[in-house]
Amino acid sequence: GKKVVAIPCDDWQEVQGINGNVELAHAAKYMQERINTEWMKKGVTIYDPNTAYIGPNVTFGTDVIIHPNTYLYGDTTVEDYAEILPGTWLEDTKVSKAEIVGPFIRRKG
């Protein structure tokens, strides 16, 4: 037989199985909360974390503000003091220092 090994894990959600759409939705929500929480701890203001979707490769500068219903994906970089207004979709793009983007804009690099 094969050897079975237990691996300690602080958060069971990091290793949960995904066997259907319900589990997939729960895992996506967990990752959204985890990413948003980390950025808020680093000083990014996210007015509505439930409607801000930030991909794992997105980076932020200092004192960035993210409004509700925003989508930031790919290798997007948001520099210091920028503000992302509601309804904005950014993918593989750069937001310059103190730039205000949106509302209701889609920008792809």
Residue ranges and their predicted role:
Residues 2-109:
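Left-handed beta-helix
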